[in-house]
From Swiss-Prot:
Residues 14-24 have a biased composition (Low complexity). Residues 1-10 have a biased composition (Basic and acidic residues). Substrate binds at N253, K432. It catalyses: N-acetyl-alpha-D-glucosamine 1-phosphate + UTP + H(+) = UDP-N-acetyl-alpha-D-glucosamine + diphosphate; N-acetyl-alpha-D-galactosamine 1-phosphate + UTP + H(+) = UDP-N-acetyl-alpha-D-galactosamine + diphosphate. Uridylyltransferase involved in the biosynthesis of UDP-glucosamine, an essential precursor for glycoprotein and glycolipid synthesis. Can use both UDP-glucosamine and the 4-epimer UDP-galactosamine as substrates, but no other sugars or NTPs. Acts redundantly with GLCNAC1PUT2. Required for gametogenesis and embryo development. Disruption phenotype: No visible phenotype under normal growth conditions, but the double mutants glcnac1put1 and glcnac1put2 are lethal. InterPro entries: Nucleotide-diphossugar_trans, UDP-sugar_pyrophosphorylase, UDPGP_fam. Expressed in root tips, stipules and mature pollen grains. This is UDP-N-acetylglucosamine diphosphorylase 1. Optimum pH is 7.6-8.0. A motif (Substrate binding) lies at residues 134-137, 335-336. Residues 1-32 are annotated as: Disordered. Optimum temperature is 30-37 degrees Celsius.
Length: 505
């Protein structure tokens, strides 16, 4: 559920008068709404919220009352109870994903790729694809308080993650119009649904507006907020961030399902004729937004959901992997900590790969029908993941629990799920940690982009000069020039580029 805004209001109370006595009635006592809320909170064991009531100013009392009134207490209590109860319960054993559930890079023919590419472009041309961006996070671990999508990883162009992704959408729209149109080329529009959080919403909207939506039409972008939930102690009590406000946190990237439903954007998608939804996380600089090949594969398989996967780099890599839960059970994702050493290292003797090798990289495709089903099913389920974190509280940081759903929590609901292998060096360059960390830094992502684009330019007949070792530099190809290395010959053949630089139109 998406909570309403909780900005302070300083409206004066209006005094009531009677004509018979001309005596002004006293203003309602601040304790009246408080007393009613205390009685409600007692039903859920949360009445301690008001323990410091007498020490609060009138404005603080008003803020606290409205903070509590804005909560769906029955829903939140159900989530807390169900989630705490689920801890420690036995779970079904896991099995490797069957080989025939995965479209591997080596197993695809050129004919497959061509067929899926054209199917995807035709579907995009017909307006049947929508794109959902998960971008509720701030760049805190990158040393920035801005929305993570505003981050510039240091490419020659200086473009942010948001701009790169917007320009990929522009490129796909152009490709669909050029390849599919019979007769005069008509414009193609992919609607972009951008999920923010209460912490990033205003800044994200302003960023897009100030950059003129990076060439997209303003009305083809819809912003919506994911929900928040109170942080709780290990026994389920609300944690107070200040004496007059609850500590809250976003409800995880799996909150996208409820957020789309509560914002009525699933209805909006249906009204636009959208049947398929591409969903991805903001912090992957190599993401192929609205990938026609992935879309065509998804349609060809007739699945309800699909995910791109990459092979684990090594047994101890700290990534979630796809598994089957229970004998012949549904597909789901388990964290690396759930795999013991022997399972993580086990080899499939037939393929020579790790048995549990398919890493989740938050690149998904869904049918709209399935999203509607999941939005209802996950809400009824009410079991959230409990993440133990340091929570800001009125007594300093304290250990507590954040309640989160994950995007992959939907997969057990799917009647069919397809996995689509992609190459890490082509489609997965995460930006999660500050430069100087061991992995997933802006610098490591920048180098992955430059190396990939350098290969594109050389394949298209271009040449490079460089004053530093080539492994530390390269060229950047603007998404407005090429989506995945295509159509570069006219720009690159016979030309020499001095790295680092951006190749643009």
């Amino acid at each position: 559920m998406i909570e309403p805004s909780m900005e302070r209001e300083n409206g004066a109370l209006t005094a009531a008068t009677t004509t018979t006595t001309a005596v002004t009635s006293p203003p309602p006592m601040a304790s009246s709404p408080r007393q009613a809320l205390v009685e409600r909170l007692k039903d859920y064991g949360q009445e301690d919220i008001f323990s410091l009531w007498d020490e609060l100013s009138p404005d603080e009392k008003d803020f606290l009352v409205r903070d509590i009134e804005n909560l769906d207490l029955p829903r939140i209590d159900r989530i807390i109870r169900c989630s705490l109860h689920s801890q420690g319960l036995p779970v079904a054993a896991i099995e490797p994903v069957p080989e025939n559930w995965v479209s591997t890079v080596d197993g695809r023919t050129m004919e497959d790729r061509e067929k899926w590419w054209k199917m995807g472009l035709k579907t995009i041309y017909e307006g049947k694809l929508g794109v959902v961006l998960l971008s509720g996070g701030q760049g805190t671990r990158l040393g920035s308080s801005d929305p993570k999508g505003c981050f510039n990883i240091g490419l020659p162009s200086g473009k942010s993650l948001f701009q790169i992704q917007a320009e990929r959408i522009l490129c796909v729209q152009r490709l669909a119009a050029q390849v599919v149109s019979e007769g005069p080329i008509r414009p193609v529009t992919i609607h972009w649904y951008i999920m923010t959080s209460p912490f990033t919403d205003e800044a994200t909207r302003k960023y897009f507006s100030s950059h003129k939506y990076f060439g997209l039409e303003p009305d083809q972008i819809s912003f919506f907020q994911q929900g928040t939930l109170p942080c709780v102690t290990k026994d389920g009590k609300f944690i107070m961030e200040t004496p007059f406000s609850l500590a809250k946190a976003p409800d995880g990237n799996g909150g996208v399902y409820a957020a789309l439903k509560c914002s009525r954007l699933l209805e909006d998608m249906a009204s636009r004729g959208i049947k398929y939804v591409d969903c991805y996380g903001v912090d992957n600089v190599l993401v192929r937004v609205a990938d026609p090949t992935f879309l065509g594969y998804f349609i060809d398989k007739g699945a309800a959901s699909a995910a791109k996967v990459v092979r684990k780099a090594y047994p101890q890599e700290q990534v979630g992997v796809f598994v089957r839960r229970g004998k012949g059970g549904p597909l789901t994702v388990v964290e690396y900590s759930e795999l013991d050493q022997s399972m993580a290292s086990a080899i499939n003797q037939r393929t020579g790969r790790l048995q549990y090798c398919w890493s989740n990289v938050c690149l998904h495709m869904f049918t709209l029908d399935f999203l509607n089903q999941v939005a209802t099913g996950l809400e009824k389920d009410s079991v959230y993941h409990l993440a133990e974190k340091k929570i800001p509280s009125m007594n300093g940081y304290t250990m507590g629990l954040k309640l989160e759903q994950f995007i992959f929590d939907s997969f057990p609901y799917a009647p069919s799920t397809a996995l689509f292998e992609v190459l890490r060096e082509e489609e997965f360059a995460p930006v999660k940690n500050v430069n100087g960390s061991n992995f997933d830094t802006p610098e490591s992502a920048r180098l992955l982009v430059l190396r990939l684009h350098t290969r594109w330019v050389i394949a298209a007949g271009g040449f490079l000069t460089h004053s530093v070792p080539l492994y530390a530099t390269g060229v950047e190809v603007s998404p407005l020039c090429s989506y995945a290395g295509e159509n570069l010959e006219a720009i690159c053949r016979g030309r020499t580029f001095h790295a680092p630089c951006e190749i643009s139109l």
